[in-house]
Amino acid sequence: MTDKKVTRLRRARKARLKMHELEVVRLCVYRSSQHIYAQVISADGNKVLASASTLDKELRDGATGNIDAATKVGQLVATRAKAAGVSQVAFDRSGFKYHGRVKALADAAREAGLEF
Protein backbone atom coordinates (compact mmCIF):
# COMPACT_ATOMS: atom_id res chain seq x y z
CA MET A 1 0.00 0.00 0.00
CA THR A 2 1.10 3.54 -0.57
CA ASP A 3 2.08 5.79 2.30
CA LYS A 4 -0.88 8.05 1.54
CA LYS A 5 -3.35 5.19 1.91
CA VAL A 6 -1.65 3.84 5.04
CA THR A 7 -1.88 7.22 6.77
CA ARG A 8 -5.54 7.58 5.76
CA LEU A 9 -6.35 4.15 7.18
CA ARG A 10 -4.50 4.95 10.41
CA ARG A 11 -6.52 8.17 10.81
CA ALA A 12 -9.73 6.22 10.13
CA ARG A 13 -8.88 3.50 12.66
CA LYS A 14 -8.14 6.08 15.34
CA ALA A 15 -11.45 7.89 14.78
CA ARG A 16 -13.45 4.65 14.68
CA LEU A 17 -11.98 3.49 17.99
CA LYS A 18 -13.10 6.75 19.58
CA MET A 19 -16.61 6.36 18.13
CA HIS A 20 -16.73 2.77 19.37
CA GLU A 21 -15.84 3.93 22.90
CA LEU A 22 -18.62 6.51 22.81
CA GLU A 23 -21.09 3.91 21.46
CA VAL A 24 -22.70 6.21 18.89
CA VAL A 25 -24.37 5.53 15.55
CA ARG A 26 -22.01 6.65 12.79
CA LEU A 27 -22.36 7.91 9.25
CA CYS A 28 -19.47 6.28 7.43
CA VAL A 29 -18.32 7.72 4.09
CA TYR A 30 -16.10 6.14 1.46
CA ARG A 31 -15.12 7.84 -1.77
CA SER A 32 -13.44 6.41 -4.81
CA SER A 33 -12.43 8.25 -7.96
CA GLN A 34 -15.78 7.55 -9.63
CA HIS A 35 -18.29 6.99 -6.81
CA ILE A 36 -19.15 7.92 -3.23
CA TYR A 37 -20.78 5.64 -0.66
CA ALA A 38 -22.43 6.40 2.70
CA GLN A 39 -23.67 4.02 5.39
CA VAL A 40 -25.33 4.60 8.74
CA ILE A 41 -23.88 1.91 11.03
CA SER A 42 -25.30 0.92 14.43
CA ALA A 43 -23.46 1.75 17.65
CA ASP A 44 -22.14 -1.78 18.10
CA GLY A 45 -20.98 -1.89 14.46
CA ASN A 46 -22.90 -5.04 13.61
CA LYS A 47 -25.69 -3.66 11.46
CA VAL A 48 -26.09 -1.19 8.60
CA LEU A 49 -29.21 0.85 9.33
CA ALA A 50 -29.29 2.87 6.09
CA SER A 51 -27.10 3.28 3.04
CA ALA A 52 -26.86 5.22 -0.21
CA SER A 53 -24.35 5.56 -3.00
CA THR A 54 -23.98 6.83 -6.52
CA LEU A 55 -24.60 3.26 -7.65
CA ASP A 56 -28.25 3.43 -6.51
CA LYS A 57 -30.82 3.36 -9.30
CA GLU A 58 -31.98 6.92 -8.61
CA LEU A 59 -28.47 8.37 -8.86
CA ARG A 60 -26.73 6.07 -11.32
CA ASP A 61 -27.84 7.90 -14.49
CA GLY A 62 -26.23 11.28 -13.77
CA ALA A 63 -22.62 12.14 -13.04
CA THR A 64 -21.32 10.05 -10.15
CA GLY A 65 -17.92 11.45 -9.18
CA ASN A 66 -18.64 15.10 -8.45
CA ILE A 67 -19.93 17.34 -5.68
CA ASP A 68 -23.51 17.37 -6.99
CA ALA A 69 -23.65 13.57 -6.81
CA ALA A 70 -22.24 13.64 -3.26
CA THR A 71 -24.94 16.14 -2.27
CA LYS A 72 -27.66 13.84 -3.60
CA VAL A 73 -26.15 10.86 -1.75
CA GLY A 74 -26.10 12.91 1.48
CA GLN A 75 -29.77 13.82 1.12
CA LEU A 76 -30.74 10.24 0.28
CA VAL A 77 -28.85 8.64 3.18
CA ALA A 78 -30.33 11.20 5.59
CA THR A 79 -33.91 10.47 4.52
CA ARG A 80 -33.30 6.72 4.74
CA ALA A 81 -31.71 7.10 8.20
CA LYS A 82 -34.64 9.16 9.46
CA ALA A 83 -37.02 6.52 8.09
CA ALA A 84 -35.05 3.93 10.09
CA GLY A 85 -35.46 6.02 13.25
CA VAL A 86 -31.99 7.55 13.41
CA SER A 87 -31.68 11.30 13.89
CA GLN A 88 -28.27 11.74 15.52
CA VAL A 89 -24.99 10.32 14.16
CA ALA A 90 -21.25 10.77 14.44
CA PHE A 91 -19.57 11.59 11.12
CA ASP A 92 -16.92 9.04 10.13
CA ARG A 93 -14.99 10.48 7.20
CA SER A 94 -12.81 7.34 6.94
CA GLY A 95 -9.60 9.35 7.08
CA PHE A 96 -10.48 11.49 4.05
CA LYS A 97 -10.05 15.26 4.23
CA TYR A 98 -13.19 17.15 5.19
CA HIS A 99 -13.24 18.93 1.85
CA GLY A 100 -14.95 18.69 -1.51
CA ARG A 101 -17.21 15.67 -1.96
CA VAL A 102 -16.96 14.54 1.67
CA LYS A 103 -17.94 18.00 2.92
CA ALA A 104 -20.78 18.26 0.38
CA LEU A 105 -22.21 14.92 1.56
CA ALA A 106 -22.02 15.99 5.21
CA ASP A 107 -23.65 19.37 4.56
CA ALA A 108 -26.49 17.78 2.57
CA ALA A 109 -27.11 15.21 5.31
CA ARG A 110 -27.27 18.00 7.90
CA GLU A 111 -29.71 20.01 5.79
CA ALA A 112 -31.89 16.91 5.36
CA GLY A 113 -32.24 16.59 9.13
CA LEU A 114 -29.37 14.47 10.51
CA GLU A 115 -27.61 15.89 13.56
CA PHE A 116 -23.86 15.41 13.88
Swiss-Prot record:
Any one GO biological process: translation
Gene Ontology terms for molecular function: 5S rRNA binding; structural constituent of ribosome
Any single Gene Ontology cellular-component annotation: cytosolic large ribosomal subunit
Short name of one Pfam family: Ribosomal_L18p
PANTHER family: 39S RIBOSOMAL PROTEIN L18, MITOCHONDRIAL (PTHR12899), LARGE RIBOSOMAL SUBUNIT PROTEIN UL18M (PTHR12899:SF3)
Subunit structure: Part of the 50S ribosomal subunit; part of the 5S rRNA/L5/L18/L25 subcomplex. Contacts the 5S and 23S rRNAs.
HAMAP family referenced in this protein's UniProt entry, alphabetically: Ribosomal_uL18_B (MF_01337_B)
Protein name: Large ribosomal subunit protein uL18
Gene source species: Pseudomonas fluorescens (strain SBW25)
